[in-house]
């Protein structure tokens, strides 16, 4: 919660996106805007608060006394490293003692499975994991970080059982409120890449998350 209260997200996103506004989007949603059936509108969630005093108070209430906070990242994905560097600066401004551990991606993936080896790590979630709320890693008790909060898991179980779209959306709205109250994961926003395709390539679907070459051909 202190981390969530402390950070000023826009300069972080802007820096990571190379200063290009078309390559980032500020959004508190756990689902992306490209999936409107799950994109909620809940004003007042504690996201991008930029509230240093609140962050300091939360650290004090938690009994934090400057112990090293192990934050894993990697330079193999430059955007992750940039996220970590600027976040580190902002967190240290409110009293965190950040031990930034820069490792290769394979080591990060291995170490993140052992909660004794770190306190937080950088990562990103692709749109393929967002098509339904029951697929979201960030609210899963089985994914590194282990969002095992009882209320979050109760809502996820209800989402898995419910078939009425309106009731499922209401549950997903409720999940956002609980998620931001518990703050198991810190949501920054959305990043976008740039993809170039020759005019001779036909049948390629630009809207999917990762490259697929099924039914793609060259027309020369």
Language-model features: locations:
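Short, solvent-exposed loop/beta-turn-alpha elements that line the ligand-binding surface or hinge
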Residues: 33-53, 111-117, 134-163, 191-220
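Periplasmic binding protein-like
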Residues: 83, 89-141, 171-172
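Extended ligand-binding regions for polar small-molecule ligands
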Residues: 1-14, 152-169
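Generic, well-ordered alpha-helical scaffold segments in large soluble proteins
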Residues: 2, 6, 15, 58, ...
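Structural transition elements
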Residues: 22-61, 77-80
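Bilobed periplasmic-binding protein-like "clamshell/Venus-flytrap" ligand-binding domains
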Residues: 14, 61-79, 120-124, 163-199
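Periplasmic-binding protein-like
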Residues: 1-35, 83, 178-187
